[in-house]
């Protein structure tokens, strides 16, 4: 980790750079896989599963028997934990239901919105070094609440052709309709265009590596919607002298163990805390099973000392972290001044892990500075809002002349005429 003291504003841009990925030829590679899946369907997906996931599959779909067996392989303790998390996620996201009210904008003119679930959604759950069954809950639970009729899930199998039982248990619990053994670019392409087995969906959700991210971006150009641009995970801890260095170090490491391209940053007003956190990170790192991954990630990480909370907040809002932990004396007051962040964790007893798993908030969040413009996944991500309007005779009389005037000045005579013929009909009735 890099220790930095009182950096000038001129240094901030360089200071806040995310780890750079080598994307040379990335999109060309991804595009060729997408085109192959689009043309050849299941045959191409099975071929790429053999190539990239090193598994020979006879079919892509997970069978009911596999789901049933998976339930017996998950411990009662983990089942209880997953069920508790599901309940909290359900409670929080159900509270976000949209209730559209009819609004009379003027006499005889009424407008309103109706919320409708996206009919078919696709969820991508990465494989890699950890089974992310928590992400199944974060995506499938709000999809179910939103009223999505078909929830399709793709996740890469292991070399024996099996999916982690906790992923299957969570998927069944959350109401996933269909599960497929497919990972990477081929999974995104299958959901975007459909194959003999995998249904075409209207919107794709879920994290992934740079290939998955590139695939989502390419298919979203014209064929399907996606949740948001995604990149390596990140956390910032904003702390003052009141913070516990043990807690801060644990939070930084919990992010660092995600992957070698993750980023963890401390911004603090206390030089003493900066020094103590550095030592504590080294101590805790030595005890972690995933210490090699975390250590590599920490090369991208920084402990930054600033002069006061005003500067800390300015730097924070410039960085726009995916996760922001505020461990300061008056953390609620500090939180009020945060304008750019994906999800915020307040006080010394609120670790990022809580939001990652079970507090109820969603952990699918904007990274790479996109928190300046994007929100994290919520119930709104799975719905569309359709607008309605109704105009009665008194309404068209009141609003009609204004429409005619505006249409005439935009030289759109047919627009004007659509109102004029109605006004004449009312006059002659």
Explain the meaning of each model-derived region.
Residues 1-119:
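N-terminal Rossmann-like NAD(P)+-binding subdomain of aldehyde/semialdehyde dehydrogenases
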Residues 103-169:
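Conserved small-residue-rich beta-alpha loop and adjacent elements
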Residues 318-429:
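C-terminal core of ALDH-fold dehydrogenases
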Residues 1-7, 178-183, 303-308:
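Short acidic-hydrophobic, aromatic-tinged amphipathic segments that line or gate anion-handling sites
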Residues 175-263:
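Conserved NAD(P)+-binding/catalytic subdomain of aldehyde/semialdehyde dehydrogenases
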Residues 258, 266-341:
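A glycine- and small/hydrophobic-rich beta-loop-beta segment
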Residues 98-103, 225, 262-267, 287-297, ...:
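Flexible, glycine/charged-enriched surface loops at secondary-structure junctions
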